[in-house]
């Protein structure tokens, strides 16, 4: 099912990825998208959202830094993208951390149809209404079944859910996959999850099967991080960051297939 050819489609087509994101990660997200062959646009003015929806191949909404004006822009952009039949991805950064974030995400989910939602276990648990001890924008700790959370949110919101962690879990409510690739250094650089959301968006833009696109994006991204770590003399985040960008720029179907670790995939019982 997963041949990782979506990666080549991204390189061939260069999808335009409209990002409404936060200032902490905007630069790395843009450079990461350029590295894989996509074309990023980082725009958040509500006055241009309707026009951008007609131009972009996918919209990625990231709630990392919120204010009222930005939330309004997100809603306008999401509705316009839905009208234009442009896929939309949500990264609910830190949704479990504050009541304001939870309120905003519930409003976004109510007004916009998302093709995919990507976050950590704590963020998706908050959306699912499951008990979880959030730690700011980090995953925190909890005992709930991550696969069950993914299935629940996917079914409730008719979307594909991508839960990042030591093992990534992807579900569309019917099908699921577990991915065990990835460098331990990824969580040590700010914005690695946000960039993954943007990368997932670029794959979704060129692949009709959103579940397949999401799995292949997660594997390809994680495998690139492993190749970057192999180049390190010392396993430090400052050295890893530019090597990871280089690994994204030089990734290939062959490299991904050689190291892909899909632990399990199939249909929910």
UniProtKB/Swiss-Prot annotation:
Keyword Coiled coil: no
Molecular function terms from GO: ATP binding; hydroxyethylthiazole kinase activity; magnesium ion binding
GO BP annotation list: thiamine biosynthetic process; thiamine diphosphate biosynthetic process
Binding site for substrate: 42, 191
Pathway assigned in UniProt: Cofactor biosynthesis; thiamine diphosphate biosynthesis; 4-methyl-5-(2-phosphoethyl)-thiazole from 5-(2-hydroxyethyl)-4-methylthiazole: step 1/1
Catalytic activity field: 5-(2-hydroxyethyl)-4-methylthiazole + ATP = 4-methyl-5-(2-phosphooxyethyl)-thiazole + ADP + H(+)
Leader peptide range in chain numbering: none
Entry keywords, A to Z: ATP-binding, Kinase, Magnesium, Metal-binding, Nucleotide-binding, Thiamine biosynthesis, Transferase
NCBIfam families (alphabetical): PRK09355.1, thiM
Name of this chain's protein: Hydroxyethylthiazole kinase
Annotated source species: Listeria welshimeri serovar 6b (strain ATCC 35897 / DSM 20650 / CCUG 15529 / CIP 8149 / NCTC 11857 / SLCC 5334 / V8)
